[in-house]
Amino acid sequence: MVNIRSNENIPYPAYERICNRGFSHANRLYDFNRVKYPLKRATWSIEEPHVENRGSDEWERLSWDEAAKLVADTLKYNTENYGARSNLFLCSAGNSFGVYGGSFTGNSFANVNGYTTLDVCLDYGDLHGIGQVTGGGWDFNQRNMSGDYRFAKTLFIWDTNPPNSQPHNWHFCIEAKEAGSNLVVIDPTYTVAASQATKWVPIKPGTDPALGMAILNVVIANEWYDTDFLREKTCAPLLVREDNGHFLRSTDFGEDGPAQLPEYPFYGMLLLQASKANKVPTLEQTADYVVWDADANARGAINETANPALEGRYEVDGVKVTTAWTLLKEHMAECTPEWAEKITEVPADTIVELARMYAQDAPSTIYAGYHLYDNCEVMGMTWATMAAITGNIGKKGASIGHLGKDKPYLNRTPDLFPNGLTGLANDIPWLALNEILETGQYLGKEFPVRLLYNVGA
């Protein structure tokens, strides 16, 4: 490797810049301690692995052909003697899409052969939280392309420092500011990003959910929400049963309806139009969800009711229900700016101004970091709910998340499942692996582990 430079042939010159991880490849390639050749533990064989000798630091060098054959023979031996699921594949990490990454090929190989894949249980708080509201994972709940920032009138950079962590994206933020956008940085530290902000908001570490909920409180109290967006593109008008907290469905009354629809026992905004995301029902399936028809003063199906009520409590065939929007408003009523000030150390009047900027100086985008605090999934839910009630999602200049659509996560399904869903791999959480190795069981059933195929992690 002589030099690292960006792809000069891409159609969008603004995306030619390289991230820090890309620049680090030369150091990784020429690192003194890098393993450069295939190695096998000296006493190891497929039939007799001699696990007691692990840690002995005694190795035998193999040729690449020998190594490939050994892996193939081991996979075959394990499949024939212990079942395909005994081969575990871990093919995901920060290097998954770089020069040394193998996420696509490794997971595709596991899926085709019915091996077990390990879910690495990434502690991306905002990713999991946003996904609880919008549905889906990598493929849906992320912000627009970075070049879209210039269309945002307000850009929140929340607990991340792009000049250091994502310098290839930072210029988009500066260009948005130069175009007239409000550049708001929320961060406990006066970072490089904060030094360039229109407004810097220091906050007590770990208290971001309280700030977000107070912003929701202000938006709701001042009626700065987007009523049409709430009614047409979120779960706000859906009726929630008081007895079990689930959405009311026509099948609750013995009527025919789609089977096995997912439950969403939370008060946030489910974007019904995201029907192609991993966990969100299709538009046809949502016919099972029930709303209150404000014109007919009776219950109706979500896809057949032109004017569903956003607020109110009702009784449907003896079942007491409340709209999801009413529940959200009631839940946020206690989260006043004064309440949040005591927790976050952000002045109440600053919180009101943040809410006004986000809801009124729209379209607005939230550019977030990974958020690794143990309460950050709540922050992700809060961001998504902020976006949903103000209509700041799915539009030019309006989105949420830490990975943009200019990243390679979009539409990777054909690569992971080249033959469709035939031979789909088992999947277990990484956090359960120790217990599986110790007990040989998973969820109370026998689960042998004979091989861990680790790529880029």
Residue ranges and their predicted role:
Residues 318-319, 326-337, 406:
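Conserved, charged catalytic cores of large soluble enzymes
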Residues 1-309, 320-321, 338-339, 347, ...:
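N-terminal export/assembly segments and adjacent metallocofactor-ligating motifs
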Residues 86, 338, 349, 354, ...:
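A glycine-rich, hydrophobic/aromatic-adjacent loop/helix-cap motif
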